[in-house]
Amino acid sequence: MKDKQFAIPKATAKRLSLYYRIFKRFHAEKIERANSKQIAEAIGIDSATVRRDFSYFGELGRRGFGYDVKKLMTFFADLLNDNSITNVMLVGIGNMGHALLHYRFHERNKMKIIMAFDLDDHPEVGTQTPDGIPIYGISQIKDKIKDADVKTAILTVPSVKSQEVANLLVDAGVKGILSFSPVHLHLPKDVVVQYVDLTSELQTLLYFMRKED
C-alpha cells in the first residue's frame, strides 16, 4: 500500500491524519463499521466532504454498508507511513522549541525528535533534555544530520533567521520542514514545507468569534 501514489488535493491531504485518528479511536471503542455521517461528525466536517476525500483512493467502502474501521485504520496507517518510526530534528530551542521537545510525539504517533540544534554559544548546547535528546551547536548540523540520516526538521527559529537556517537544512539533505515562522521560505521544489502560523490561526479564530456576536 505505501508504494502506491495517489494524486489528491492539498485540502484532502491535510485531513488524512484526522481520518487516521478517528479510525484509531473507533477501533479502540470496538466500533467495527462507520458511515460517512459518523466520520464527518467526529471530525467536524460534512459527510459529502468525507465521501469526496475517500473517492480519491478508490473503493474504500460500499453504499449502505459503511466503512470497515480496522481496514481503514490500516489503510491510513500505511498511507501516512505510521508503521515505522520517523526520526525528526528540531532547530531553535526557545520557548516553542522547548515545548515541542517535551511533547512525546512517539507516544501518539510514530514520530520522534532525536536531536536539537541552536546557536553554538547557547548555554544548553552540549547538554541533553530530560528525555535524553542531545542538543548540538548549529555548526554541527551537517555532520549530525548525515550520521543520523534525518530528512525531516521542525524549525522554531526567529523569523529573521528562518531562511538562513532553512538553507542550511536543505544543504545538509533535509527534504521536509515544518516551520513555525510566518516567513515564506524560498527552497528547491523537491523540499516540502508546511507552515504553522499561530498568530494567523488566532486572528482567524477571533474573526469568526466576532462574526457570531
Curated annotation (Swiss-Prot):
Biological processes per GO annotation: negative regulation of DNA-templated transcription; response to redox state
Its keywords, alphabetically, are: Cytoplasm, DNA-binding, NAD, Repressor, Transcription, Transcription regulation
Q: What is its main location?
A: cytoplasm
Task: Give the binding site residues for NAD(+).
Answer: G92, I93, G94, N95, M96, G97
Recorded hits in Gene3D superfamilies, A to Z, give: NAD(P)-binding Rossmann-like Domain (3.40.50.720), Winged helix-like DNA-binding domain superfamily/Winged helix DNA-binding domain (1.10.10.10)
A GO molecular-function descriptor: DNA-binding transcription factor activity
What does this gene product do? Answer: Modulates transcription in response to changes in cellular NADH/NAD(+) redox state. Binds to the promoter of the aldehyde-alcohol dehydrogenase adhE gene. Functions as a redox-dependent repressor of adhE expression.
Spell out the family assignment given in the record's similarity comment.
Belongs to the transcriptional regulatory Rex family.
- What's the name of the protein? Redox-sensing transcriptional repressor Rex
Q: What is the lineage of its organism?
A: Bacteria, Bacillati, Bacillota, Bacilli, Lactobacillales
